[in-house]
Amino acid sequence: MSHDATIERLYVLDAGIAQVDDASIYSPGFNVGKPMTLSCNAYLIRHRGQWMLWDTGTQDDLIGEPEGRIIAHGIRGTISKTIASQLQEIGVEPDEIGTLALSHAHYDHVGNCRLFTKAEWIVQTAEYEAMFGPDPDAFGFRPELYGMLRNNRLRLIEGDHDVYGDGAVRIIFTPGHTPGHCSLLLNLPETGRVVLSGDIAHNRRNFQCRCVPSFNVDAQQSIASMNRVEELLAAEGATLFVNHDIAQNATLPHAPDWLS
């Protein structure tokens, strides 16, 4: 498929790091007992003079805790910058974010939802039902981080979704990590097409090896989603940005710089 519309800018926001003592939770049977550090990002998109935020990062209140905090799945979250301060540096107020979408509802992706209660929230029906169902803890979700979104303007979707109707920003349904997990396909004027992975894999090697984390909700869906993204990369000539791949993350410009 081919789409001509392009976004104006993509800002990569630093959402801290995540640390685990046993990397095999992301690759069962491999790297057992080895520590692992993962990058965490949120992404600010400028399109048609409007602002969209993809994920909200690890909660800003960790800025006062240099040792971080174990939040879920035994993962320790640490931040060195707040999302709010990075938006301020760009010159954007939280209330100016018109559209909010989340790859999924784990803590490092929903930590600052409270800042964006004026935005229209786009969410897969399957993810919404897991987030607000009887047992969010079964999915590793923390409702205190995102519960306020119930009062946002809501756009419930099922499957792929063209956010602006012009092909520039397309939500790709990639379930398995969570029931309604999504990735994002962007078209940039200079960089070209980019897929923001969400958590379909936590580094490039795990993507290539089709490693399925032990806490994913559906292993078969997880592999199918990785296969689908690989096919999408080939069809679109797109580059994969693996959110938690700390080596790749070090090569990307971060806010206030941007990709165009």
Regions found by a protein language model. Give the residues of each.
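Acidic, His/Gly-rich catalytic cores of divalent-metal-dependent hydrolytic chemistry
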Residues: 7, 17-21, 204-210, 255-260
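Short, electropositive alpha-helical surface patch
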Residues: 107-113, 180, 250-260
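Short hydrophobic/aromatic-enriched beta-strand-loop microsegments
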Residues: 120-125, 196-198
